[in-house]
Amino acid sequence: MIVEVFFRNFYRNFAKFEIDAVDKREFAFQPFSGGMVRHKSFKSLEDLRKFVVEKTPRHIYHSAAYYERPGEEDMERKGWIGADLIFDIDGDHLDTEACRESKIVSLRCLEDAREEANKLIDVLIQELDLKPTRIVFSGNRGFHIHVSSEEVMKLGSRERRELVNYLKAVGFDPSRFIAKLGRRKVVLYEEEAVGNLLRIKQGVEDARAMKVEIDEVVTQDIHRLIRAPGSLNGKTGLVALPISLKELDKGVEYIVDKAIAFRKGHLKFKFEKPVEGPVLFEKVGGREGDVKVLPAYVAIYLELQEFGKIYD
């Protein structure tokens, strides 16, 4: 499979994984042939890289959790130490016009996801005093926000569920809130900190402004697997790209362009489904049965999305 050859070359020569405490993480891999290989562990990033070059999986994941024995197959015997707090913002979950109508990676939909990521980061920093450790473009339609700190590491599923409810404004009732003088906070009558005045004001005017659209299952699961930062997204061929807050603010065109892994060369592609419009900055038009020469990253994206096949 030509795409697999491109993936192997990337992992051999260009991949830069950004994963903390590798020796305490469980890793999982989805091969190009399908299925899932779980409960793998590695002593170092170099050991991980060697394995990936040899096996060349389509998807690479690691656990949000840290374990004493990450390679143990029995979850009860892994020895759970703690877990990062992970937030997943995905265009598939955003009820916006751009995301509803998007069948392929749309810059408009991704811009909606970027705005939601910025909203989440503002809430984490300003209201919860939690600083994101890593911001990652997923390589597809969204962003992953990682928080790694002692204060969140030991949170159980119940506490994480409560945090999800807060972020999604579950049960929000403006009449229950009062401003606390001398601070840019609002509190419950029970003196429980709940957020800054601007978001509460917006929430009173429009309940949707209070909500942060995260995938709640990802955040509350203390054993969750998340796409490995620096790996290739097997649905697109783009890099799951760690970015800074400044890079997030540069916009989605900058981010997607930086995430393109296969910039060199062209490939012959036979369409099995019609495509008309921009695909990763490239204007593409093809009907079923058409054969066209496309930039490598576009052809790889279209094959992974099952729009057709790359020809030798």
UniProtKB/Swiss-Prot annotation:
Enzyme class label: transferase
Single GO MF annotation: DNA-directed RNA polymerase activity
Cofactor(s), names only, from the UniProt record: Mg(2+); Mn(2+)
Pfam families, A to Z: DNA_primase_S
GO CC list: DNA-directed RNA polymerase complex; primosome complex
Subunit architecture: Heterodimer of a small subunit (PriS) and a large subunit (PriL).
Name of the protein described by the UniProt record: DNA primase small subunit PriS
Gene: priS
